[in-house]
Amino acid sequence: HENAEAEILEEERTQQWMSKREIVLPDIAFSDKFVLKIGDKTVNLISLGSGHTDSLIVAHFVEDRTIHLVDVASIKQVGFMTLGRPIKKYIPQLEKAMALDFDLVVPGHAALGEKQDVRNYIDYLTTLISQVENAISEGKTLEETQQILLGSMAEFNYLKRWDEWFLLNVTGVYLQIAEGEASD
């Protein structure tokens, strides 16, 4: 994606790492969509817009009815640790991916899944965000919010890493909303 080079280069740690290696940056950039033809197969690279990053794309393998979707979708598990920022921008990115014609999703950091698994993650995130917003508007502390959501979001406790990461997810969303960063 056309924004990737700037994001890659602005990271100090990345710059240090790159200074010790010969790195070839992308020489093809696109804004919204790039179509690859590989034999009789079509792969659409589609920008998901601003959110987790400004260069996040989904690879849509048209004939195989498969997408490769990284970082914004945790398939069959809760989101990683305190989640990324800004969390509210994940929802439009995920909805854009959902508009594609696919059956299988290949994530970057979770199990393979189906289209319904992406919908389930959207439901998880929207519920999490909404309930944290409600708790904050009621003046609840982070700790109170965590305890409330452990009960009110129990319908999602089937997700992997619930015990490890759910309270961290609540913490991340709470801090983003409290600090006004959830939709920046």
Language-model segments: which ranges?
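Accessory terminal helices/loops
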Residues: 3-13, 99-100, 112-184
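A generic fold-level signal
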Residues: 22, 40, 53-54, 165
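Proline-rich low-complexity regions
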Residues: 24-29, 79, 107, 148, ...
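Metallo-beta-lactamase
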Residues: 1-127, 131
